[in-house]
Amino acid sequence: FGLVGSLAVSGVSSNRPGVRVNTLLEFLGIADENLQTQVSILGLIAASVLVFKSFASLYLSKRTLFFLSRRSAIISRILLNKLLDQEMLRVRGRTIQETIFALTAGVQAVTLSILGASLLLIADIFLIVAFSISLFLVDTLVAILSLTLFSTIGILMYSLMHRKAQRLGELATKLEISSSDKISEVVSCYRELSVKNRRNFYAQEIGEMRHSIAEAGANLGVMSLLSKYIMEITMVVGGLAIGAAQFIAQPATRAVAVISIFLISSARIAPAILRIQTGLITIRTNIGTAKPTLDLIEEYLKEGIADLDPVEGYKGREYFKHTGFSSHVTASNVSFTYPNRKKEVISNLELNIKEGEFVGIVGPSGSGKTTLVDLLLGVIHPEFGAIKISGSNPAEIIQKWPGAIAYVPQETSIINGSIKENICLGYLASEVPDEVIIELLRDVQLEEFLTLPGGIHSSTGERGSKLSGGQKQRIGLARALFTNPKLLVLDEATSALDATTEKKITSFLTSIKGTLTIIVIAHRLSTVKDADKVIYMKGGRVLGEGSFEELRG
């Protein structure tokens, strides 16, 4: 289109077209036509090319956006698979909000923003090259002047802005994550902040962060506008300078032709160079924005990324027979130290728990009980020694017999959903018969849920806001029993219960002992008085074991 416009201007400005213009007119077969016919044909060609370009651009843009969006989803899934394949300590090495950002907004910044801008850059570079070639055919001097002038301005603006753009992107990302963390904190600690009348402290802190984010966004917007206006000023000043020089050195008709060609070429070259410069700034900005994601990708690429096992649906409780699994647990000379700490949390620990035993593990805070639980669950691995369940390490057992080991934490996490969905955690609730859930609720003394208007489909509220602490823990126990485990680990799971409910749960555990191995971590000795064996830990070691009466004595 730029070439056709340039040829039209050359034809208007001179009775005798230049050699290159005339050659092209001959190629089109209109060299002998009058000027009006030539301009009409050239205009029709230009309009046709422009319409075709618009439809082609729309089609390619649609394909590109869908391609990048799908790549974004695939990258998020791959990174999430790798994240969930890590040890718990590495997963918790980042804040929840930082992880969420890295897997969502950060991935979009990498694909839709960085890769998308890169593809647009390539298209604009090809556009400039094609237009420059056609412009060289019409007027070499104008082509050189236009490319040199606008390229110099574009390079200069990029060199002055790109570092600041990346810093602003990093700052905005950091503040975005921090503000999300603060919002989560104020919601989680609402009662404590209310009684202190300090909710306004968080409101002010979050408000200041959002203000800084807004300022960073405004600065980036100003940089984009600045580039646009500088390029427009360059077009005007460049046109005036070239015009003045041409009127001094050339006849008026030639000067008008050169100015016209420059303005037409500027109308195509300047916006393309501006888009390239803006695209490069966008890339640098989003490199800052995507830093958490890029760090995650770099970290995982060093280790290799393996996909997780395919997801299987619910196949009925008979599927959870765990044939061949033995719940015999041993620990041989096990030691463990947390990263960046010198003192061992578990030190030369020896353990032997027979299949079907009900074992209580007690000890003061900091004795290593919860760390031992994490080692048994395979979410962390011993630094020295070995833990074996059914003759293999816990991670292998979980892969071979999923659900054979179950866990009830000290504080059960409740998802935003129904009672049934919480018990079916990790499975589609719609695939599980209601009778299975009703039986589990009766086992854990939660029959009151059955009388609710919605029954087991009643909502638990935001993070279990409609439940008491004891109800949450019993849902956690029902969740653990859902997969018919052969080894059940409870980490102070009854500490939030009242004495009556704790007694009922303890009685239930006593009634099922022998059918599975039960390991109960407790502070209160009363919780483990019916255990077959009680283990006393202190300083990461087993200092004694025996019956409840023996240890109490």
Task: Go through each PLM region and give its residues.
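Transmembrane helix-loop-helix hairpins at lipid-water interfaces of multipass membrane proteins
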Residues: 1-52, 136-148, 252-256
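Hydrophobic alpha-helical segments in the permease module
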Residues: 46-53, 150-152, 228-235, 256-278
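Juxtamembrane loop-to-helix connectors within ABC transporter transmembrane domains
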Residues: 84-129, 188, 212, 216, ...
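Transmembrane helices of ABC transporter permease
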Residues: 120-171, 241-258
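Cytosolic ends of transmembrane helices, especially the final helix of ABC transmembrane type-1 domains
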Residues: 191-194, 198, 222, 268-301, ...
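Helix-to-loop junction immediately C-terminal to a conserved catalytic motif
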Residues: 377
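ABC ATPase nucleotide-binding domain helical subdomain, centered on the C-loop/LSGGQ "ABC signature"
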Residues: 386-391, 420-461, 506-507, 515
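ABC-family ATPase nucleotide-binding domain "signature/switch" substructure
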Residues: 406, 411, 422, 440, ...
